[in-house]
Amino acid sequence: MRECISIHIGQAGIQVGNACWELYCLEHGIQADGQMPGDKTIGGGDDAFNTFFSETGAGKHVPRAVFVDLEPTVIDEVRTGTYRQLFHPEQLISGKEDAANNFARGHYTIGKEIVDLCLDRIRKLADNCTGLQGFLVFNAVGGGTGSGLGSLLLERLSVDYGKKSKLGFTVYPSPQVSTSVVEPYNSVLSTHSLLEHTDVAILLDNEAIYDICRRSLDIERPTYTNLNRLVSQVISSLTASLRFDGALNVDVNEFQTNLVPYPRIHFMLSSYAPVISAEKAYHEQLSVAEITNSAFEPSSMMAKCDPRHGKYMACCLMYRGDVVPKDVNAAVATIKTKRTIQFVDWCPTGFKCGINYQPPSVVPGGDLAKVQRAVCMISNSTSVVEVFSRIDHKFDLMYAKRAFVHWYVGEGMEEGEFSEAREDLAALEKDYEEVGAEFDEGEEGDDGDEY
């Protein structure tokens, strides 16, 4: 089996996690108590969905997931919510006091008390797997727990499970919508370790997803539930090929191989189509070509950056539902002819496609319409650098005056870590710049030391 363990850290990670597991259960026909009436092989454990669920002798399906937070309120919602019987109580780990939006608390003082317990639980889940493939890590880098404890856990996972791939789904601060003053600090400090310890990181940002909800679903005032349900569709599309048998299956390791040209250039944009409300879907016929085009629209991107300002290095298109390879090839051929979608000159093919015959499911009473086919795109584009340069700029404004730094130093951090992390990000911006640069500017001579 190719099991994946999901790790949900901090409020954002947990709430996105709730939306994801709700959707997985719907897709597989698993009830809120973990029973699965449609499963004929009780305790068999060789079904495709066993990559994400483990099956007990009593025929109950338990998610291979861990939820961690430094304060109890968000996890208590899971403990008392609809799916309280789905999770094993040991999988829900909560501390007593909050990281208070402080990376240093999440990473040093409070985080380190809880991290061994987390690794212990993860070890139990891993021992239960026959062929662990990797980890999906969900967190946000603006807060204290997601950034601090998130990085700490990733660092420790690298030590314990060096060869396993780690995919991060990371909520980055938005340009306009801010939830805390020290977001830029937390993000920069956290990205410093995301660079080292994740293989692929998919950037999400609330503002971009708000706009998609407003524009495409006509929700005037989107809530986090609306946002998370949209994000969960993306994550479900990515993992569908692990959970169902399909035509062109895409493995977690394949993402890495196809999307990451250089180890540091691993921050991805994602988009999903069709995002459409039930009222509209009734009147529209969404062909493969149409949904493919709309996945490439800048307004469909789930992070606030414009792919037209950069170049694509690689794209992964995951189709699900009523889609045949012939349609996909035609749609991709059309995309390649468009002048607005530019690829770097050293990567002429640039597309990896996957097809899964399981049509997309939607949460009953949710905002999305039930459609016959959908596509999720994960792309590696040099325009992602906009996300980093925005955060770096805000970081510089605050750090020049050393504002708020004493809170971090007081929790046992050194001021040098700030400048080290900031330099690492400056180097990352530079890397993106070089990757997007054309080769014909007389660079041939000095890239002999690259390889």
UniProtKB/Swiss-Prot annotation:
Signal peptide annotation: none
Binding residues annotated for Mg(2+), in chain numbering: 71
Task: Output the PTM entry.
Answer: Undergoes a tyrosination/detyrosination cycle, the cyclic removal and re-addition of a C-terminal tyrosine residue by the enzymes tubulin tyrosine carboxypeptidase (TTCP) and tubulin tyrosine ligase (TTL), respectively.
A GO cellular component entry from the record: cytoplasm
Could you tell me which SMART domains the record lists for this protein?
A: Tubulin (SM00864), Tubulin_C (SM00865)
- Keyword Protease found: no
N6-acetyllysine: modified positions: 40
Catalyzed chemical reaction(s): GTP + H2O = GDP + phosphate + H(+)
The main enzyme category here is hydrolase
Residues the UniProt record annotates as site (Involved in polymerization) = 451
Query: In its UniProt record, which GO terms are filed under biological process?
Result: microtubule cytoskeleton organization; mitotic cell cycle
Q: What is its main location?
A: cytoplasm
List the subcellular locations.
Answer: Cytoplasm, Cytoskeleton
> Which keywords appear in this protein's UniProt record, sorted alphabetically?
Acetylation, Cytoplasm, Cytoskeleton, GTP-binding, Hydrolase, Magnesium, Metal-binding, Microtubule, Nucleotide-binding
Write out the residues that bind GTP.
11, 71, 144-145, 179, 206, 228
Co-factor requirement: Mg(2+)
Q: Does the keyword GTP-binding apply?
A: yes
Q: Which GO terms describe its molecular function?
A: GTP binding; hydrolase activity; metal ion binding; structural constituent of cytoskeleton
Q: Which Pfam families match?
A: Tubulin, Tubulin_C
Q: Which family does it belong to?
A: Belongs to the tubulin family.
Which PANTHER family has this protein been placed in? TUBULIN (PTHR11588)
What does this gene product do? Tubulin is the major constituent of microtubules, a cylinder consisting of laterally associated linear protofilaments composed of alpha- and beta-tubulin heterodimers. Microtubules grow by the addition of GTP-tubulin dimers to the microtubule end, where a stabilizing cap forms. Below the cap, tubulin dimers are in GDP-bound state, owing to GTPase activity of alpha-tubulin.
Quaternary context: Dimer of alpha and beta chains. A typical microtubule is a hollow water-filled tube with an outer diameter of 25 nm and an inner diameter of 15 nM. Alpha-beta heterodimers associate head-to-tail to form protofilaments running lengthwise along the microtubule wall with the beta-tubulin subunit facing the microtubule plus end conferring a structural polarity. Microtubules usually have 13 protofilaments but different protofilament numbers can be found in some organisms and specialized cells.
Protein's recorded name: Tubulin alpha-2 chain
Please give the organism: Zea mays (Maize)
